[in-house]
Amino acid sequence: MELLSSILVFFAGLWAGTINAVVGSGTLVTFPVLIALGIAPVTASISNATGLVAGNAAGAWGYRKELKGRGRQLLRLLPASLLGGISGAWLLLHLPEVVFHYAAPALIVLALLMVVFQPRLQQWVRAREENPEHALKDKSHGLLLVVLVYLAGVYGGYFVAAQGILLVGILGVFMTGTIQNANAMKNILVLGVNVVAAASYLLFAFGRINWAVVAIIAVSSLIGGVIGSKVGRRLSPPVLRGVIFALGLVALGFMIANLLK
């Protein structure tokens, strides 16, 4: 990989690691850059997901205080995330590559919509927290919650982007606690999905992984995860969403252009 390309990937990984620790959707930063550099979509997806594991781990560790008292809930939900991640990775590796070419733009649009509507979702969750009727009972035992976490894992294993936003919304609605508690649990569940997905890629798609990309994103996202867990929460959410949305549109443009060739 050329020096300029490596620098671009490094800073994309740094920003993605920071964003993932705070709001999720870091893949909407790294994925467009990899596509713009001419890397095939599936190779870009699996290399990106593998590299971001380090950043996920850093973000999860940084939010460990917000996990206090959530151990039992995590033990109930983590298996669903892991199974979902394996399912999503299997779909990515076994469906024809042309499916990903057509599915990725639609998934990016879905992820961008989640980014755009995130503030309203968070306002709704906060309103529930302040309503005593919704604070009386923790609904984490519900089968629906487990199913939704599994489906978010499938989505994450197939296409990493914005699974964090999905999970924050799901956890915020179905469990008691604050947004920060939901975000901390999200970091653990996303880490689980990405670990099992990366393991699947290592076992069954080793030759399709771009290891230069993995190494650069691993180092830079690790640094970004530390930054995000410490000071990233002080950054303006509108600015973060604006950057994510702009880069997501770039990715969408590249993909549509490739489809029209």
Residue ranges and their predicted role:
Residues 1-42, 126-183, 215:
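Selected transmembrane alpha-helices and immediately adjacent juxtamembrane segments
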Residues 6, 49, 104-108, 112, ...:
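Residues within membrane-spanning alpha-helices of integral membrane proteins
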Residues 10, 14, 18, 49, ...:
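Residue-level signature of the transmembrane alpha-helical core
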Residues 24, 39-40, 96, 178, ...:
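A helix-boundary/kink motif common to multi-pass secondary transporters
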Residues 47-106, 195-238:
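Selective hydrophobic functional segments
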Residues 57-68, 106-134, 252-261:
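Transmembrane helix exit motif
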Residues 70-80, 104, 129-130, 184-189, ...:
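Cytoplasmic-side transmembrane-helix entry/capping segments in multi-pass membrane proteins
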Residues 87-91, 149-159, 196-206, 251-261:
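Hydrophobic alpha-helical transmembrane segments in multi-pass integral membrane proteins
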